[in-house]
Amino acid sequence: MRFLTTPWARGRRAAAADRRRASPTVTVAVCTLDRRDQLERTLHALRSLTYTAFEVVVVNGPSTDGTAEMLEGFDHSLRVATCGVAAIGASRNIAVASAAGDLVAFIDDDAIPPPNWLETLLPAFDDPLVGAAGGAVFDVPLGRVDWQLCTCTRLGAGNTDSPGPISRYLGAGADPVAYLAGCNMMIRRSALQQVDGFNPLLTGAYDDVDICCRLNDAGWGIAYVPAAVVRHDRAPNLTRDDQQTIRDPYRILASRAIFAMQSTVAPDETAVVAMLAESLREWTVFADQQLAAGHLTPDEHQRFVEQAEAGARDGLAAGRGPRLVTVIPDPPRHLFRPYR
């Protein structure tokens, strides 16, 4: 992890400018991939937000389901960017670079916020040292709040209902470290600029853990606001099916390996390898259970195990390299377009 004097100073100056604004501007960022109908519902829900100083930026991945056409014909003011790869880290960086607001609020394309969502999160930023704030997530398929005070070890073992207070999980090198759910987090743009944005190697998981980890290690505070609850449908994606069952663990294991290798200055590769071996055993047991229950065919079972092994192998190799640096430009404030 690298910290340069210039980005640090620039980040602090920008944070000071944020504080001078009575009503900070917010960019609501929605990264999407092949979820045309869910995205359209989310965009309509954002019209009900009661905070007025916000814009919406949609980053469309390589969708093939008519998402681009829907966005072209959408009858409300929003800005659209594209991401040529199916990778959440890269997509979030495009959203941040496009954001004209002082703060960037991330919500998933299959999530619905309450009308007071932004107002509930904003007071956390009255503290100039807070770099990120987020709330709880109501898991619609489970029918309950499932993401509350989230923490994760530097080896990628997560807990979405950790005992408080959050201060137990903050401070340089904290392990486990507090993080915010990626579908319900607001981050100071200047802080994102300082830490070089999201890790583009993280294609489908641990992007939220990684950004909070690096913000924490850079000295920024992280606030958990339990009253800010977002409803999350957890629609099918490249990893899970419509029954919420993991069908391809590649991205999970690859992203976990990358995070574990790059979450500290001097990673313990022996510990990472041991963690991956145990994780592979657990995923193999899961695949065996799915096969026995008739949810996987023998061919699907074989592919599942092969994908798990490939994810661990490829993630470890990628994690050994340097973290890719994304230079976040200054905000294009002239492009700010209030969402109506």
Where are these regions (language model features)?
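Short, flexible, basic/aromatic active-site loop/helix in glycosyltransferases
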Residues: 153-177
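Short aromatic/hydrophobic "clamp" motif used to bind/position activated sugar donors
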Residues: 104
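A conserved acidic beta->alpha catalytic loop
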Residues: 45, 52, 60-69, 111-112
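A short, conserved alpha-helix in the catalytic core of glycosyltransferases
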Residues: 179, 183-196, 201-229
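Non-catalytic, C-terminal membrane-associated alpha-helical segments of glycosyltransferases
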Residues: 268-340
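Conserved donor NDP-sugar-binding/catalytic core segment of glycosyltransferases
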Residues: 115-153
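Glycine-rich, basic loop-to-helix element that forms the pyrophosphate-binding segment
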Residues: 82-99, 171
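N-proximal low-complexity "stem/linker" segments adjacent to membrane-targeting elements
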Residues: 1-47, 340
